[in-house]
Amino acid sequence: MTYTSGTAPNILQIIPRLDGGGAEATTLEMTKALTAAGGRSVVVSEGGKLSEAIIAAGGEIINAPVASKNPYIIYKNINRLAQIAKEQNIDILHARSRAPAWSSLWAAQKIGKPYLATYHSKVHDSPKLKILYNSVMTRGERVIANSEFTAARIGIVHKIAPEKIDIVPRGCDPTRFDPMHILDADIKKQRAAWRVEENEFVILCPARLTRWKGQMVLLEAVAGLKGNFRLILTGDTRDKTGEESRFAKELKARAFETGLSEKLVFAGHVANMPLAYAVADLAVLPSLDPEPFGRTAVEAQAATLPVIVSDAGGFRETVKEEDALSDSSTNRTGWRVSPGDVDALTDKLQTVANL
């Protein structure tokens, strides 16, 4: 069926939680687009920080235990989602994560509605059981990939024909991230909150606080920097139990060992990322594994920040380093370094700090 502005679809988006992350941000953006087109976005999740934003954008929230990987809960969710879809007059069930995707697929089959999924996460190629579990993301009418890199991985790992895969790169609203829209008073207040001193070079790592995002590598690289700087790490320092995570403790211990404790700020969850980018002089995304897309690199560039990213995955599609050190900025959007290469990262950090 082809939809027009007069027949925009009612979409059921199923996502485990609505906290910070690329999949969650895309759920909000889809809600805005559907509402603007005259359709409806009904989001089934266990709630989170973005729930209010989705409602404000015209979406509807239905709470259900769709984050669970318990087979019994997944089975129970089949009827639950089928009932929701019928009651809400849903046209398409759109899964955004693997656990609820199985329930979504079977619910769609039960009521005779189309099912599709967006592959936001890494496409694992082992073990075989994990590949089978993840294959639910490719069993619908279509599969949406967030980058050419992800699309290629889907084809290789899941043996999916290219014509079944739609590549829809993530993005951002450049107006929202334009630093000209940020008040100087707000920047000054945020700098004070993060203990940023005058003339400090502010390095921001806008990522979840988890090992594969590479914060430890960044900490080691910053330890070799010369000059006056401040390192800001975003992301919740607590684990699912509410206690300080093991990784956060390791970062703090290493910062103490390298003498960086006074230079390091754990910012926690940051709701106002445009303001965070406005405070920073540089954004660094040193992921150890290839990012499927890497939305924060796009956001940072929209905020006119120079970026340093890992030379892998989706970053290769969004961060171009041709002529990076020339006077011309025609082709330059940032710098890429090999994942995990501390010395190379230190060198690039020093290069940008000296510009």
Where are these regions (language model features)?
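A conserved nucleotide-sugar
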Residues: 40, 197-201, 215-265
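A conserved, positively charged/aromatic
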Residues: 109, 115-145, 152
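Conserved acidic donor-binding segment of nucleotide-sugar-dependent glycosyltransferases
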Residues: 320-342, 351-355
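Short hydrophobic beta-strand element within catalytic cores of glycosyltransferases
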Residues: 43, 306-309, 316-320, 326-328
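Short His-centered aromatic/hydrophobic patch
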Residues: 95-101, 119
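A short, active-site helix/loop in glycosyltransferases that binds the activated sugar's phosphate group
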Residues: 140-167, 172-177
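A conserved mid-protein helix/loop that constitutes part of the nucleotide-sugar donor-binding site
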Residues: 24-29, 201, 208-224, 343
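Short alpha-helical donor nucleotide-sugar binding micro-motif in glycosyltransferases
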Residues: 85, 269-270, 276-280, 295
